[in-house]
């Protein structure tokens, strides 16, 4: 994906379900955005996107589906964020071009483990573009693009149908994930 594929994601409040009409297991994400010293960063921006429960991004879905599993959320005064989406599943990178040919020549598979993408930013701090990978996802140890780091793998706790963390009645099992982000101060610009 390139930046033009991501532009225009809606600004939504904390607690929003980003996965309305998206296939996949419901998942509640929460955590904080902190500085290196552990100070919460209020009003930090999380630009979030993921595929559906079958590994398809909205631009890969048939028809005009609009933006799905995407949104921009700001942290609260304590640096907290929370939203609902889906538990990401593994998927293949395109194999019909040079990357596919390279992977084939190397004897490597084209799969990425399940992950959700985020660009996390705050005024005065270096932005970070990253993923949260689902612990236990297939291909964690052999990601086609070598993007997995242990620090980016999060536990997805499974819960039976019942009351979700937002008070919503869930008629299917759901997951919860807690993950904190740390941002470095921006480098000062030389005069």
PLM region spans:
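Beta-strand-dominated extracellular/periplasmic modules and repeats
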Residues: 4-191
């Amino acid at each position: 994906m390139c930046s033009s594929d991501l532009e225009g994601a809606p600004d939504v409040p904390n607690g929003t379900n980003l996965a309305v009409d998206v296939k996949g297991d419901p998942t509640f994400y929460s955590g904080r955005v902190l500085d290196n010293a552990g100070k919460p960063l209020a009003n930090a921006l999380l630009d979030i996107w993921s595929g559906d429960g079958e590994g398809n991004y909205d631009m890969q879905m048939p028809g005009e589906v609009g933006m799905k599993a995407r949104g921009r959320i700001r942290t609260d005064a304590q640096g907290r964020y929370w939203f609902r989406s889906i538990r990401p599943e593994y998927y293949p990178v395109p194999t019909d071009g040079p990357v596919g040919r390279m992977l084939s020549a190397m004897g490597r598979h084209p799969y990425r483990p399940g992950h959700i993408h985020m660009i996390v930013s705050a005024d005065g701090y270096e932005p970070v573009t990253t993923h949260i990978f689902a612990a236990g996802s297939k291909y964690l140890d052999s990601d086609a693009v070598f993007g997995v780091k242990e620090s980016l793998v999060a536990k997805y706790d499974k819960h039976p149908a019942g009351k979700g963390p937002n008070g919503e009645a869930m008629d299917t099992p759901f997951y919860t994930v807690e993950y904190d982000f740390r941002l470095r101060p921006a480098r000062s610009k030389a005069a």
